[in-house]
Amino acid sequence: MKDTLPSATQVLKEAFDTLDSALENFSPVLAVQHVGWVEYIGKGIARVGGLPGVRCEELLAFPGGLLGLALDADEDQVGVVLFGDYTHLQAGDEVRRTGRVLDVPVGDGLIGRVVNPVGRCLDGGKPVAFQRQLPVERPAPPIMDRLPVTQPLMTGIKVIDALIPIGRGQRELILGDRQTGKTAIAIDAIINQRDQDVVCIYCAIGQRAASVAGVVTELRNCGALDYTIVVVAEGDAPPGLQYIAPYAATSMAEHFMEHGRDVLIVYDDLTRHARAYREISLLLRRPPGREAFPGDIFYVHSRLLERATHLNEPRGGGSLTALPIIETEAQNLSAYIPTNLISITDGQIYLSPELFQKGLLPSVDVGKSVSRVGGKTQLAAYRAVAGDLRLTYAQFEELEAFARFGTRLDEETRQVLHRGRRVRAILKQTQSSPRTAPQQVLVLHSLNSGVFDTVDEEALPAAEQAICAAVSEIPEIVDKILQGKTLSQEDLDVMHTVAKRVTRPFIKLGEEGHAGAAGDAT
């Protein structure tokens, strides 16, 4: 026992010496923290006092790890938008400044994942592995950092690629009433990017969870989730999350664009985004304007969509193509949000409920749809085979309206109606069945050259399928189409010959001679 006492004493002495040394070396640093308190809690917002120096759009920390975004700064209070469950908050709770703005994770680790607007995974997988973080709000690239839109972005949808072409870096609005196929067009465009080396982002704003789950399942089944990021702010999410969702998704897209990649982003939809911002503004007691929207609603959407562009080489050379979706009411295109977005974007694709009810899918109203930029990017082969298609279709629709009155029609008018019905039938396309550019060019050339004129209407889908399969027989012409080269008359003749041969089994009885005459005349 006596032998152990010195060792115990020695241990205690060493311990106290270590503590004394630590105390001598300890030099406390004072840290100033700006602390306020909650004065009022509303639906998704809070009013905070005691923070006179807070900056606009600064993040504030609430109890329980809840974050909020400072949007309003009055003399005595700060209006804050909350980003999570706020039911545990009460008046008097402590609020701290963070000194930073809201940012989101970006990088390849997000591809194939389903996340919320702040980057938290919603698919039950591992936490997102990210390379860096970018602010949600970023200024749009200046004019001198941009390039003209010169490369096409193929959607795989015949009526769009032929009549309303979209270029990489363009902003093309998709609008229409409820249940007219707006989301279906955007999803088909994503599916068609499978082999195009394009990163896709689908941003769901205010959608039902079941609808988003259906979209994710379709993307996964088609193999499109391998190059797609899904950003979700569900309908029951706080309005603050719905408000920042498109900005967060755009920051994720800009990371790839600045690294020289092409990106396609879909905002589904900005009508719900505008309503979420209206709700926030009314709760923050901002003065309402037209349709109760705040006065800066135009700026809210313009600063978002101006971030879509084609960058020059010093900035990375990538592109960001935006497909914003909005919902109209009773086909009213002159409402506040539709007119705002039509003026901001580079064109619009209008989906008609009347065409949808007739089963003409996609229900694109060609007369009310336009692409103000994409025409310059269209492949040369399209201009050769679909140059007059828009005019032909417009004349057909006008004549069809007059023909309903039962007047006697001359032979030329009957031929226009006959060709127009086939144009309308060929432009029909089922969902999730994109066509490649060579397939579309061969089908459209066959349409213009009269190959389909003698095919029975019921057999048109089968005849079109046969023509698409025949693309493998003309590899040299396919290469020309994909390289953007102009097709020679010899190429057109070869395409016509192939189309006539593969559609011969579908020609109506007694029309053989007429088919040959029509082809020769063309």
Swiss-Prot record:
It comes from the Bacteria. The record marks S369 as: Required for activity. GO terms for cellular component: plasma membrane; proton-transporting ATP synthase complex. It is found in: Cell inner membrane. PROSITE patterns: ATPASE_ALPHA_BETA. It catalyses: ATP + H2O + 4 H(+)(in) = ADP + phosphate + 5 H(+)(out). F-type ATPases have 2 components, CF(1) - the catalytic core - and CF(0) - the membrane proton channel. CF(1) has five subunits: alpha(3), beta(3), gamma(1), delta(1), epsilon(1). CF(0) has three main subunits: a(1), b(2) and c(9-12). The alpha and beta chains form an alternating ring which encloses part of the gamma chain. CF(1) is attached to CF(0) by a central stalk formed by the gamma and epsilon chains, while a peripheral stalk is formed by the delta and b chains. Belongs to the ATPase alpha/beta chains family. Produces ATP from ADP in the presence of a proton gradient across the membrane. The alpha chain is a regulatory subunit. PANTHER family: ATP SYNTHASE SUBUNIT ALPHA, MITOCHONDRIAL. This is ATP synthase subunit alpha 2. It comes from Syntrophotalea carbinolica (strain DSM 2380 / NBRC 103641 / GraBd1).
